[in-house]
Amino acid sequence: MTDFVRTASRLDVGKRVNYSFGLVLGVDEFRQEQYHVLAKFQRHNRQLHGFGTVWGLKVSVPAAATPADLEVRVEPGFAITPGGHEICVPARMCAKLNAWLGRNADALATLFGAPPFPVSLCVLLYYRENETDTVPIPGEPCRSDDEVLAPSRIADSFEIKLAVDGAPTSPPMGLPDALVLCQPPSLTRRAEEAFGVFWQHVKVGGGGMSDQDLHDQVLRLADPTSLDAGWPGNLGSAMQITPAQVELGLRTWALEVLPLLQATTPDCPCGPDESARSVLLGRLDLQWDGTVASGVTVDESGRPILLSTRAAQEWLSGGGPTWT
């Protein structure tokens, strides 16, 4: 018999197990199959649906009897992250706001100076995985507990964090790991939002804009300089195009703009980027005096919302809103 050594293969999103009679199934095979299926689901969510709150997850800070009771609440709900991870929050989650601010008082003072000062916080929902259902593993005697027992399941889970928004400077050295800074919207998200604004400035009818001009205008959606300057929200009168040019605009978006955006945010389903695993639920604005927070307001206007295909279909079949 020929001797061989079984080596662990690198997980590949494009491969699934091809079982043949007699094939020995080991850890590598099960991991590869799971990786393939999970990556396909996540890619489907990312590329065809997007990300955001699907339902629920409302953020509130109700009035409290004492400062210690002041809490941030997140209601049950469902969301999809920019990485395509699905997050289900089954029950209301709460966090003591003044306790969190007190634990991070030194770090906040490093960022903003001595209190009092205004603080803006992001409420972020993260996808997490937890190993669970520990079972005994057969093997040699005289092993430690770590070697005898192993988790047999991986449970989908989540984590809710408060992150600092609008810090005046980059985080200095020594900033605690527990204190997270909000990340600005990705270029892809900004371009997608601008894509919707762009079509609000388009009137389909008799035409008037050349194909080249329309192509160049749509291509600007991949230009961060144009987006920083407020384009296309600062467009003046409506652009006149023909019905045939609608397809040209969509084709330019799919064939040229999206590949440029893809190059800035590679489509990696299992990378280490935490921003791909989190979704914004809302922002809190407050005044911190070093002991208690006051004037707390909740702003959910920046929260991305993800409509179901059915809801979008019903909305569009009714003609959608009339823009003025």
Task: Identify the role of each PLM range.
Residues 187, 273-275:
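Mature cores of small secreted peptide/protein domains
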Residues 2-179, 183-196, 201-247, 251-255, ...:
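Glycine-rich, compositionally biased intrinsically disordered regions
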Residues 282-285:
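Catalytic zinc-binding patch centered on the HExxH motif and its immediate surroundings
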Residues 267-271:
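Sequence contexts marking disulfide-bonded cysteines in secreted/extracellular proteins
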Residues 243, 257-262, 273:
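Extended, basic/helix-rich recognition subdomains
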Residues 178, 264-266:
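Secretory pathway export signals and precursors
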Residues 279:
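Active-site "substrate specificity/gating" loop of NAD(P)-dependent dehydrogenases
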